[in-house]
Amino acid sequence: MTAITNISAREILDSRGNPTVEVDVILEDGSFGRAAVPSGASTGAHEAVELRDGDKNRFLGKGVLKAVEAAQTEILDAIGGMEAEDQVAVDEAMIELDGTPNKARLGANAILGVSLAVAKAAAEASGLPLYRYVGGVQGRVLPVPMMNIINGGAHADNPIDFQEFMIMPVGADSLAEAVRMGSEVFHTLKGKLKKAGHNTNVGDEGGFAPNLPSAEAALDFVMDAISAAGFKPGQDMALALDCAATEFFKDGAYAYEGEGKTRTIEAQVDYLAQLVATYPIVSIEDGMSEDDWAGWKLLTDKIGDRCQLVGDDLFVTNVERLSRGIAEGTANSILIKVNQIGSLTETLAAVDMAQRAGYTAVMSHRSGETEDSTIADLAVATNCGQIKTGSLARSDRLAKYNQLIRIEEGLGPQALYAGPSALKQLARR
């Protein structure tokens, strides 16, 4: 009854106004699943490949009609008649059909759209919410959000070199309370920025993008906002960074163009260690460049016992790169982005590998998002304990928070908010 009978796909717009792929899957019993695919601004060189049309006369070359066509024809021909409940077989069939190591022929955007829509259709056929269908009865941990309230780097037009400054409501008792706490800090920060004469326009992910001179200036504003909102920094609300260091790694050094400084690999490690010592920073993502394995190892050895070090561009949700990191003792956490690897099966495999090795996993959005809230369900399904899905503004970000609120309500007394237990390093402090 769960045989796949039809796939329809279309070109829709993401939160930046760029085209992306949306896929509908229909099963033999009439069950329906729909998924929309996100897109990143700062992308790792080792990510699976989005298929873009390259026709400069449409969407400045960013159209996705080729991926749409692939989903509706070649992929449908390959998986039509297969059981949607056999997710692994469906995903493996698409990967084999593509035949490239990075999904470049059919496009990770086509394959992922179908993969997620198949899972949603199978969940509907089983009468279960997606988080329960994917995670079983064990999926009940609501993640601590990483809320991106100041944007810099590739996500904003300002001098700040780091891409994201985030708050984590580790002291909340529930997901709903965590969202409330984050919202209160967000609005308090807005008032303080405005009072100081800064603009309060928001970046791609809903955070503010003020013209501040340095990371320290941004962190000071965030600390002030946390206190002014009535919370204790480091206790109620911890800090997290996404440096996106690959974006400013040039000629073997880290070029802080906004600050007018260049730091060697060793100086970059020392700088991040200094920030962790000065502020209640419990997580740093991409503190070193994606192929600076030596720098990553230095950073891990220096502060990995007291700070979560998240590999995004480093690992790109890829089990081969993650296995190298585990073997070398590099980083201690992986960012999970479904479109970096391009299928649900491979995404779940990366989470499983990380958790078995004692690494944490952070479920994540992309800067180019849609109203699709699948990652909220996946965060609960995998019990990963952390989610990164933007600020407390823009409906494309709030769709995920709102879905988590619904999931928490649906779980009732079974729901468990991860809190400080989500970060091993925080428990040691």
UniProtKB/Swiss-Prot annotation:
Record's GO cellular component terms: cell surface; extracellular region; phosphopyruvate hydratase complex
Pathway: Carbohydrate degradation; glycolysis; pyruvate from D-glyceraldehyde 3-phosphate: step 4/5
Catalytic activities: (2R)-2-phosphoglycerate = phosphoenolpyruvate + H2O
Keywords tagged on the record: Cytoplasm, Glycolysis, Lyase, Magnesium, Metal-binding, Secreted
Record keyword Secreted present: yes
NCBIfam families on file: eno
Name of the molecule in the record: Enolase
Classification via Gene3D superfamilies: Enolase-like C-terminal domain, Enolase-like, N-terminal domain
Family classification: Belongs to the enolase family.
Organism of this sequence: Methylobacterium radiotolerans (strain ATCC 27329 / DSM 1819 / JCM 2831 / NBRC 15690 / NCIMB 10815 / 0-1)
Cofactor(s) listed: Mg(2+)
GO terms, biological process: glycolytic process
Membrane spanning residue stretches: none
Positions annotated to bind (2R)-2-phosphoglycerate: Q163, K337, R366, S367, K388
Role this protein plays: Catalyzes the reversible conversion of 2-phosphoglycerate (2-PG) into phosphoenolpyruvate (PEP). It is essential for the degradation of carbohydrates via glycolysis.
CDD domains in the record: enolase
PANTHER family the record matches: ENOLASE
Pfam families linked to this entry: Enolase_C (PF00113), Enolase_N (PF03952)
